[in-house]
Regions:
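The Walker A/P-loop phosphate-binding site
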Residues: 1-87, 206
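Helix C-cap/helix->beta junction micro-motif
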Residues: 60, 137, 175-177
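Helical mechanochemical/support elements of P-loop NTPase systems and associated helical scaffolds
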Residues: 22, 72-76, 122-126, 145, ...
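Conserved inter-motif catalytic segment of the P-loop NTP-binding fold
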Residues: 64-157, 217, 238, 257
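Phosphate-binding/switch region of NTP-binding enzymes
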Residues: 27-29, 42, 46, 55-56, ...
């Protein structure tokens, strides 16, 4: 249905609304997460994609749906307890198992995040979860995380299609006004310096997303590179990375700039 722009303004705008900024170094470069579109966060296994996304989720504090098909409940619980106590996540794992009431109380400040831990969710299930979120809370999730792309169950013409999944999720983002962050793998054949270039994103799934970030991890440093950014700075080579101090044991990131 077509309508006048004036009507769109009067009825309220959600698509294009930025989510809260978490890091000044990202905001200064125009790296922002907008509702109504998809964001890809790509890297090789062990490049701290999930830790970065988790930090963003925990700090933004907006209505969130998290599809965690690559990390189980106990690992997630351990990391968020570690962030709150600044103690090693392995210690928090044992603490959560021994004292679940204590762990539940510590995590009660995250009740605005809904979780789905299905190891192989279908696109239909993801859409149903998004609709259920809206029915429960009276509004669509401002942020949806799909972690990770390759474990979403989808078939097109008899074969899997990562591009088809992103296309479907991009439409869902536009229809609901959610920002959908999608974690994905990159090709290990593409060198990183230390972050990989845009072409390292597998299966050309980056075509639809307005923001694509690649990640790397070395020692106590986390690297994040904007290799595609419709609304700010980008360098497709991956050379222009932003550095963060990272403590994997407590899942905490700190800006170095």
């Amino acid at each position: 249905v077509s309508f006048k722009l004036a009507r769109a303004v009067r009825r309220g705008l959600t698509n294009g609304e930025p989510l809260p900024d978490v890091f000044r170094s990202l905001k200064d470069r125009g790296i922002r997460f907008y509702r109504g579109g998809t964001v890809l966060v790509g890297g090789v296994p062990g490049s701290m994609k999930t830790m970065f996304i988790g930090h963003m989720v925990d700090t933004m504090k907006v209505p969130t749906l998290y599809i965690s098909n690559d990390t189980n409940e106990l690992d997630i619980i351990s990391r968020y307890l570690a962030r709150r106590t600044k103690q090693d996540s392995n210690i928090m794992r044992m603490k959560a198992l021994k004292d679940p009431e204590w762990a539940a109380e510590k995590l009660s400040d995250m009740d605005w995040v809904r979780w789905n831990f299905n190891a192989s969710p279908s696109l239909e299930e993801i859409e149903e979860e998004m609709m259920a979120f809206e029915e429960l809370w009276g509004e669509h999730a401002h942020l949806v995380v799909v972690d990770i792309l390759m474990k979403v169950d989808y078939y097109e013409d008899g074969g899997g299609s990562l591009e088809g999944i992103v296309r479907y999720l991009d439409k869902l983002a536009r229809d609901t006004g959610s920002c959908i962050i999608i974690a994905c793998h990159t090709s290990e054949n593409e060198d990183g310096h230390p972050t990989q270039p845009l072409k390292a994103i597998l299966n050309k799934v980056s075509k639809l997303s307005t923001l694509v970030l690649t990640t790397a991890y070395d020692g106590n440093t986390f690297y994040l590179a904007p290799v595609k950014n419709r609304n700010g700075f980008a360098d497709s080579t991956g050379y222009s990375s932003i550095q963060f101090l990272v403590d994997p044991s407590t899942a905490i990131l700190e800006e170095l700039e």
